[in-house]
Swiss-Prot record:
Source organism of the structure: Arabidopsis thaliana
Free-text comment about domains: The TIR domain mediates NAD(+) hydrolase (NADase) activity. Self-association of TIR domains is required for NADase activity.
GO MF terms, alphabetically ordered: ADP binding; ATP binding; NAD+ nucleosidase activity, cyclic ADP-ribose generating
One Pfam family here: LRR_3
Enzyme class: hydrolase
Active-site annotation: 87
Name assigned to this protein: Probable disease resistance protein At4g19530
Catalyses which reaction(s): NAD(+) + H2O = ADP-D-ribose + nicotinamide + H(+)
Positions of region (Disordered): 1134-1189
Length: 1189
């Protein structure tokens, strides 16, 4: 914390603190003690001594405007004084320019906020004498101050007044210190109004205060660890504001130390004066009264050790600078000293003494909000040019901020360039940014850092730009030429990452959009230190690059200076013909890629590359070779793959990769998908480090002629759709994790070729049974056998697959039973048996998801299903023989029984209710037309109990952790259940809610819609969703315009998941019965906002609900609708039939059709309605009622 003298000296002519208080109540006690304590710290305080004598209020307002901080002391009699209230209104008007700190003296913040009790009564009485219509402003000011972070005090508590005063004084000193720091950062200008201040503010980075706070915590200047010696390294992207931050930080805290020093632009100083002068410069700053004539610390060690030192070093680019300045720092820096260093790159091995504590602070990019403020400081410094089109300019401003991604210097340069330019200029500039940088940004931000890179780092940076967003391991493999360890690439990538040229996200190598654009521009012109070209042609969306590419393609032979050559056939829009020797001269080519950006799967493009005659490709340096629709039978004989890492030839014409065995020690990835003529893989026999092999769609391939020694490193093997494959080699691949044999329709027998498998796909194969040695797959987690129509049974020892989590047997129509031993499988979570003939399910306690849909054999479920406590999802769609459903598991979230045309009864209760903070659950009984009346009553009773149970849970648990929609169900029916208090015919429900309807125990709402087919509609609907728009408007005329909110809720949905066919394969046509949709949703933040707005007042409210149904065929409509307001019960929580079923209504007399407060008339919603997302923000702001600084 800065000393009081340093704070006072910066603004001696102005009042620093203005005291706002009720004089009769506090002047001669608390306020006088507070005033004395503030003045004792040399803080200039203004107290309105002359108010009672009739001084003009305008004079007081001027004093408030001149102050830095206002202390609003809210007491019980505060609202008796118009003076206090008008001063408070003025303080609110100065928000952002004046720091207001409230002290709640013997009054609760909530009482101030809602003007309750005697405090509110006094305000009403004061209003009676108010002829200026100030009441609305007074209330707004009281609400404003109640939401600020302040100090509550109750004289009856144990806390002493003196303790409170000490806290207030400390807070004032801290605030003044920060204000002083901000002024010094912006040029120490006077804080009066005018253009000078706006210019100074624009030079300061938005969000600086937050950065200062974070750096303060890292350096530990205050707090429990302030006695530690700390060296903190401040790093960040070029232009991110390191120097601005360090200067502000130094000015803020230098007065806490008797010995301090700030050295800036150290790298430039070393260039100008040499490294040897650094130590002397630092000593002169630390010991200004000494005659420094030595360049070593030793003669001054005793004097330095008398006090802790505060050192800030900015602009260091070399490790030697730090070693020179901080050598043997333990011998001359007293314990508790703080040293802050700003560097252009992270240091991985700085001052490595064992007991030395080191910290790094990464300067963050600006948030979108701070970035927008920072940009607008420069782009709109003179507002007149943009007054006529503010919204359009602001929209464009946000796009520029998104592009800059919070980079302060880029935002500043963009803002300066755009200032006073036309809107059309802004729009064109925004379009050009991804393709071309302005010279100012390139030279001042990016080129400087790029020039500091070594040649290896420059090459790596531009190469990485070619493979932006690719996997880190993949990029390392491409960059390195020393083998699988890729140690050199690791060092280079780490260096680029430390210099913030790249970053790693989700194991992928990324770079800032600006750096990518810079690399895109620089790549085609890049040169080695000796002047030789190292061009990269890859981004045709850039006009300059496209032009270079066209010129390159017109040459009779390729260029030796090209390092990467990427050709996007989709962008070319035409076939390309290359000479047979076109690529022959590209001796330095490392990355060759002919692809189509139109399709991520690289399906066969319309445009192709033609090469008449034999292709010549004598390239040794190629790491990456991607050639979509490769036109030849094989790669040419002169191709040398000794450095090849990645080979990708999708949809090619090859029959074999190359004619003879070739040494390919670095080849790790091979993708030949949909090369339909491929017959022979013998060319890969020397690819001993191969990890991934994709042969999907290679229909001519009949076998894998590769031995285990050739595939020892293979982790992934994809043979999907290899319809010619009849058998697998009997080998053991010790590294294989994933094997895909999906749609190998001629594969009748499977045997284990790897005991390390994690995932196995056998979908659509002709296998009849699994081999007995399947039990060897002890690591198998996922087994997919969908549509294995010949599969009859599973091995008897299937439970030996102890870690299996997913088993998919969908469509295995001959599979009629499961081994009983599966009950021992404790890891199995997903079991999909749709389309099978299975009638009995083993009791697998770990199951979370069970699918039995389209099972035409099963008629009932085991009663033990209720014991599957982990089961969350049960799919019974189109189980046409299913007659009854037993009691379901307690934690079941989704039951889908759509189309169970024989279903008649359900258990009562449908499921056991337990007190819980349950997440959303859905029970679907659509098109179960044989459900009897009792079953429908059970479903509606379950829904009613579920709503009450959830409402009670919401009161017990934190509502913020409970999803909006909590329960929904649907079933055949034509009536709104009787427990809905409000009902209407049609899709619109309008009612008047009595005052206080949303207070106390109100938790949520239950919604109901009856949906039916439109007249003369015979086609079956495939899917639909039912929604409700809920509009609420208060009628409090005293508050001015009505307060309105609006939000949407999904009432329910269902999908048919395919068409039901008759025996001839035709779609069934039927008239669907009416269906009832019910949902329960929690009290949203919007309603809470309304509650806060009118808390303690008697305010009538009007509700307007409009239901709608959406289906692709537009065949459905809402016939009836209903609403129930749900309240938490007062009784202790009960379960099942003992549960209190009373759902409190919004009024004392529940109303149904024809009641006075429920109507079917249509209406419209006002356009000034506050939508829910805005209301959420408002509620969040209102809820931040902190009580301590």
């Amino acid at each position: 914390m800065a000393t009081s003298s340093s704070v006072v000296s910066s603004v001696p002519q102005q009042h620093q603190v203005f005291l706002n208080f009720r004089g009769d109540e506090l002047r001669n006690n608390f306020v006088s003690h507070l005033d004395k304590a503030l003045r004792g710290k040399q803080i200039n305080v203004f107290i309105d001594e002359a108010v009672e004598k009739g001084e003009n209020l305008d004079n007081l307002f001027k004093e408030i405007e001149k102050s830095r901080i206002a202390l609003a002391i809210i007491s019980q009699k505060y609202t008796e004084s118009k003076w206090c209230l008008n001063e408070l209104v003025k303080m609110k008007e100065l928000e952002g320019k004046l720091v207001t700190i409230p002290i709640f003296y013997n009054v609760e913040p909530a009482t101030v906020r809602y003007q309750k009790e005697a405090f509110g009564a006094a305000l009403t009485k004061t209003q009676e004498n108010d002829s200026d219509g100030q009441m609305k402003k007074w209330k707004e000011a009281l609400t404003y101050v109640s939401l600020l972070v302040g100090f509550p005090f109750n004289s009856k508590s144990k806390e002493k007044e003196t303790t409170l005063i000490d806290k207030i004084v400390d807070a004032v000193l801290q605030k003044l210190s920060k204000i002083s720091s901000e002024e010094s950062t912006s040029g120490s200008v006077d804080q009066g109004r005018g253009e000078e201040v706006e210019e100074a503010k624009a030079d300061k980075i938005s969000g600086l205060n937050q950065r200062l706070k974070e750096l303060e915590e890292k350096v530990a200047i205050t707090g429990d660890k302030r006695d530690e010696t700390r060296i903190v390294e401040v790093v960040g992207m070029p232009g991110i504001g390191k120097s601005t931050l360090l200067k502000a930080f130094y000015e803020t805290w230098k007065t806490r130390f008797l010995s301090s020093a700030l050295l800036q632009n150290i790298s430039e100083l070393v260039k100008a004066m040499g490294l040897g002068r650094l130590t002397g410069m630092l000593l002169k700053e630390l010991l200004p009264d000494e005659n420094i004539d030595e360049e070593t610390y030793e003669p001054y060690k005793e004097k330095l050790l008398k006090n802790t030192v505060f050192i800030v070093l900015d602009g260091i680019s070399d490790e030697t600078h730090i070693q020179k300045l901080l050598k043997d720092h333990r011998k001359w820096a007293k314990k508790g000293s703080k040293i802050v260093i700003a560097r252009r790159a992270v240091t991985r091995d700085l001052l490595h003494e064992d007991s030395m504590v080191r910290y790094t602070y990464f300067v963050p990019l600006l948030s979108h909000r701070d970035g927008l403020n920072h940009f607008c400081h420069y782009a709109f410094r003179h507002f007149a040019a943009h007054q006529n089109n503010k919204e359009a300019f602001m929209k464009e401003s946000k796009e520029f901020v998104r592009y800059a991604r919070g980079h302060p210097l880029i935002l500043k340069l963009l803002g300066e360039e755009l200032r006073e330019k036309s809107l059309s200029y802004w729009e064109e500039k925004l379009k050009s940014l991804p393709k071309s940088l302005s010279q100012n940004i390139r030279d001042r931000v990016l080129q400087v850092t790029y020039d500091e890179l070594s040649q290896v780092q420059k090459d790596a940076f531009l190469d990485i730009a070619c493979f932006r967003s690719h996997d880190l391991v993949y990029v390392k493999s491409l960059l390195d030429s020393s083998g699988p360890a890729f140690s050199k690439a690791t060092v280079t990538i780490d260096a680029l990452k430390d210099m913030f040229m790249i970053y790693i996200s989700d194991s992928r190598v990324e770079m800032h959009d600006l750096l990518y654009t810079f690399a895109m521009e620089l790549g085609p012109e890049a040169r080695d230190d000796d002047g030789r070209g190292r061009h990269r042609i890859w981004h045709h969306h850039n006009q300059d690059n496209k032009g270079r590419l066209n010129r390159l393609l017109k040459r009779p032979g390729g260029s030796t200076s090209v390092r990467s050559f990427f050709l996007d056939m989709y962008v070319m829009k035409t076939d390309v013909t290359l000479g047979t020797d076109y690529l022959k001269n590209m001796r330095n080519l490392r990355y060759l890629k002919f692809y189509s950006s139109h399709c991520p799967q690289e399906c066969t493009p319309k445009e192709n590359i033609h090469i008449p005659g034999e292709l010549e490709l004598p390239l040794e340096e190629v790491r990456c070779l991607h050639w979509l629709n490769f036109p030849k039978d094989e790669l040419p004989q002169d191709f040398i793959p000794k450095n090849l890492v990645d080979l990708k030839l999708p949809y090619s014409k090859i029959r074999q990769i190359w004619r003879e065995e070739k040494d390919a020690p670095k080849l790790r990835w091979v993708d030949l998908n949909h090369s339909s003529k491929l017959e022979n893989l013998s060319g890969l026999s020397q690819a001993l480090n191969l990890e991934r092999l994709n042969l999907e769609g290679c229909t001519a391939l009949k076998t894998l002629l590769l031995g285990p020694e050739n595939m020892a490193s293979l982790v992934f093997l994809n043979l999907k759709g290899c319809t010619g494959l009849e058998s697998l080699p009997k080998i053991n691949l010790r590294s294989l994790k994933t094997l895909i044999l999906s749609n190998c329709s001629n594969l009748e027998e499977f045997w284990v070729i790897s005991e390390t498998l994690y995932t196995l796909y056998l979908d659509g194969t002709a296998i009849k049974t699994l081999p007995q040695d399947m039990v060897k797959l002890t690591s198998l987690v996922k087994l997919y056998m969908k549509d294995c129509e010949m599969l009859v049974k599973l091995p008897e020892e299937f439970d030996k697959l102890k870690v299996l989590q997913e088993l998919v047997c969908s469509g295995c129509k001959r599979l009629s039973s499961l081994p009983d031993v599966m009950k021992n499988m404790q890891c199995l979570q997903i079991l999909l048996l749709d389309g099978t003939a299975i009638t009995k399910i083993p009791h697998i306690s770990s199951l979370e998801r069970l699918c039995l849909s389209r099972n035409e054999k099963i008629s009932c479920l085991s009663n033990d299903i209720r014991l599957l406590s982990q089961l969350k999802w049960l799919d019974l769609k189109y189980c046409t023989k299913l007659v009854s459903i037993p009691e379901l598991p307690t934690n079941l979230q989704c039951l889908d029984a759509n189309g169970c045309e024989s279903l008649t009864t359900v258990a009562n209760p449908l499921a056991t209710h337990l007190p819980t903070e349950q997440i959303h659950s859905t029970f679907i009984f659509t098109n179960c037309d044989k459900l009897d009346r009792t079953a429908k009553e059970v479903i509606t009773t379950y829904a009613q109990r579920k709503c009450q149970m959830l409402s009670d849970a919401l009161k017990r648990w934190n509502e913020g952790f409970v999803p909006e929609a909590l329960f929904s169900t649907c079933f055949p029916g034509c009536e709104v259940p009787s427990w809905f208090c409000h009902e209407a015919v049609g899709s619109v429900l309008k009612l008047n809610l009595l005052p206080h309807w949303n207070e106390n125990r109100f938790v949520g709402i239950a919604l109901c819609a009856v949906v039916g087919s439109l007249p003369n509609c015979q086609e079956q609907t495939n899917s639909c969703s039912v929604t409700c728009t809920f509009n609420i408007a208060s009628k409090d005329s005293k508050k001015g315009d009505p307060y309105k909110i609006s939000f949407d809720r999904l009432v329910g949905r269902w999908n048919k998941h395919g068409n039901k066919l008759d025996k001839k394969g035709n779609k069934l046509k039927k008239t669907e019965s009416d269906h009832v949709f019910i949902c329960y949703t929690r009290c949203s933040n919007s309603i809470k906002c309304l509650q806060d707005q009118h808390s303690g007042t008697c305010t009538p409210t009007e509700a307007f609900l409009e239901f709608g149904v959406t289906d692709k065929e537009s065949r459905l409509e809402v016939l009836k609708c209903g609403l129930r307001l749900v309240y938490a019960s007062d009784e202790p929580q009960k379960t099942n039939s003992d549960m209190d079923l009373s759902l409190s209504s919004s009024d004392s007399t529940p109303t149904r059709n024809g009641s006075s407060n429920t109507t079917t008339s249509s209406g419209s919603v006002s356009t000034n309605t506050i939508r829910e997302e805005d209301s959420n923000i408002l509620h969040e702001a209102q809820s931040q009622n902190g009580r301590g600084l």
